[in-house]
Amino acid sequence: YVTANWELGKAQATMTRLGEELGVKIAFFHGRGGSVSRGGAPTGRAIAALPAGSIRGGFRSTEQGEVVSYKYANRGTAHYQVELLASSVLQHVLLSERESALVPKHEFDEAMEAISGVSWTAYRQLMESEHLLAYLQGSSPLEELALLNI
């Protein structure tokens, strides 16, 4: 998860920079809504985590089906969600330039590369473990789910 998000952020930052250099408007589609278990994050935090300059005043997002009624079922909640989305995008755009000038990016990048490396190594060790399949079979309804006639 750490490495995937770090690599995605680096790719978006590179594409944003190249777009600026070449005069090409780059637009990203951020599918970050929904439950945390499916990769989602609270709206404000997900937008704040995007690379500086990657929004440029426009933002497109998805909402997973299970959260649509939760967020938009009544007028008050819907107003709050739209305000949160709009203010988060505005904040990201306004702070992107200022923060890029203030943050010693190379130190952050070096730290994230190290964290990402440790994360990737741990993930690969888990995936390559000879005991992983047995653990998953014993701790989840995997075999029962396979028998369901859906």
Task: Go through each PLM region and give its residues.
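Acidic, His- and aromatic-enriched active-site or binding-groove loops in soluble protein domains
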Residues: 46-67
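Aromatic- and carboxylate-enriched substrate-binding clefts and catalytic-loop regions
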Residues: 1-7, 16, 20, 26-52
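Acidic, glycine-enriched catalytic cores built around paired aspartates
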Residues: 2-12, 24, 32, 43, ...
